[in-house]
Every structure is written in structure tokens, then in C-alpha cells.
Design a protein with these regions (language model features):
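Extracellular receptor-binding modules and their adjoining Ser/Thr/Gly/Asp/Asn-rich linkers
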Residues: 3-4, 10, 17
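Glycine-rich and polybasic anion-binding loops at the starts of cofactor/ligand-binding domains
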Residues: 81-118
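N-terminal segment of the canonical double-stranded RNA-binding domain
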Residues: 14-91, 98
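Short, hydrophobic/amphipathic alpha-helical patches that form generic packing surfaces
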Residues: 12-13, 23-31, 103-114
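General helical structural elements
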Residues: 7, 39-40, 55, 107, ...
Length: 118
């Protein structure tokens, strides 16, 4: 399985509202064990964990938009790269949409990483 495929599987798991196991996280994110816990904690609603993961795996990227959608009451997170490119739709490569802001941030992080894979 490629890293891109592993990231796609991890994104699907998180989008489904499920907590991924440590092996799934390890396959998708090549980060130290201590940082893998950020993924689990972000799925449970920790904004601190989502922020820590963002800083660890996407250095220099910023949160361009962090808002709640008034119609669906879900959260939209848009991340911008160092060059200033960003997405404006939750269907795009680096935007997360979810009823939990930390999980939405995690989805945006994972989609940004997925988009970077060739």
C-alpha cells in the first residue's frame, strides 16, 4: 500500500467518525509515536491535538478559514500552503468539514498531506 492509499484510508475512517488504530496512523503518517497520539486525540475533539499535529506535519501552513456553516452547523477548515494556495470547498484537497471542529481540522490536515503525494 502506498502512502497516498494509506492516507485515503485514514481520511475515510476519520470522516466516518471512527477512531483509527495506531497501525493505520503509522502507515499513513510517517511521524514519531509520540505525535501519533495527536490523531487519536483530534478524532475525540481535542483542538490542541489538531493544532499540534498541524504544526508537526505541515510547517509553515496556516489556517485560512475556521468557521461554522450556518445551514448544516458543520465546521469548515481551510488550510493555506506557504505559497498561499488554498481551497474553498470541502470537496477540495485540503479542506475539512465536520460537526466537530477538531475532527474537521484533522480531515483538512490529512487531505493536504494526501494532495502533496504524487
Amino acid at each position: 500500500m502506498t502512502r497516498k492509499e494509506a492516507l485515503a484510508d485514514l481520511i475515510a475512517k476519520v470522516e466516518a467518525g471512527e477512531r483509527p488504530d495506531n497501525q493505520m496512523i503509522a502507515d499513513a503518517l510517517h511521524i514519531a509515536d509520540a505525535r501519533r497520539v495527536y490523531v487519536a486525540k483530534a478524532t475525540e475533539g481535542s483542538l490542541d491535538a489538531a493544532k499540534a499535529l498541524h504544526e508537526a506535519v505541515l510547517p509553515g501552513w496556516i489556517v485560512h478559514d475556521f468557521s461554522q456553516n450556518s445551514r448544516s452547523m458543520g465546521w469548515n477548515i481551510v488550510l493555506a500552503s506557504k505559497s498561499g494556495t488554498y481551497s474553498t470547498s470541502h470537496q477540495s484537497g485540503n479542506v475539512g468539514f465536520c460537526d466537530n471542529p477538531a475532527r474537521a481540522w484533522l480531515i483538512a490536515i490529512l487531505r493536504a498531506l494526501h494532495a502533496q503525494e504524487s
